[in-house]
Amino acid sequence: GKSSFDERNPLSLGSANRTAPKTVWKYLGDSDTIFAIGSSLTITNYGITIPSGKNIIHSTNNYEDINKDYDVEVSLLGDSKLVLQKMIECIKNNYSKNIASLEKKNIVMSEIKKVKEEWASEWNTLLNSPMNPINPYRLVNEINNNIDHENTIVTHDAGHPRDQMMPFITATTPGSYIGWGKSTHLGYGIPL
């Protein structure tokens, strides 16, 4: 989910439903491999579709998810936390001490930063709009700029609030952003 990875990390692209930061769209298009972890990879009108031609590594705890809607090259059946720990261990052992890998990582981080800056510039007018009544993107931006991210849990209601908040709220710690998936009735985004 959105708050499983600190979005201040220079390698963070953000997360997606029907809306997403520009970084998600760019790297979803540019990548040759997608690593999906803790996801059913279900094709839905409420999420993004993985473009054809991508190599997919799919980690899930439910064997019925594998090859359900997408053909995957590698399936990793197991607990997401354990799979991630093993993947991180593998990357550290094989790539983290390699100078070429470190140089490539720095280039990628620089590219991600540039795309984030472009995207922020494109949205600046709406995010800081003086419109009256207040523009919903301005409201989301004000919330994002004024909360204590480490000690606040942000959520949204169904419909447009989800699409307006998800790309612009910065999730920092696990559980700091709780998104309600797919379709819920207005006013019932949080289980009662």
Annotated model-derived regions:
Residues 113-191:
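Active-site diphosphate/adenylate-binding microenvironment
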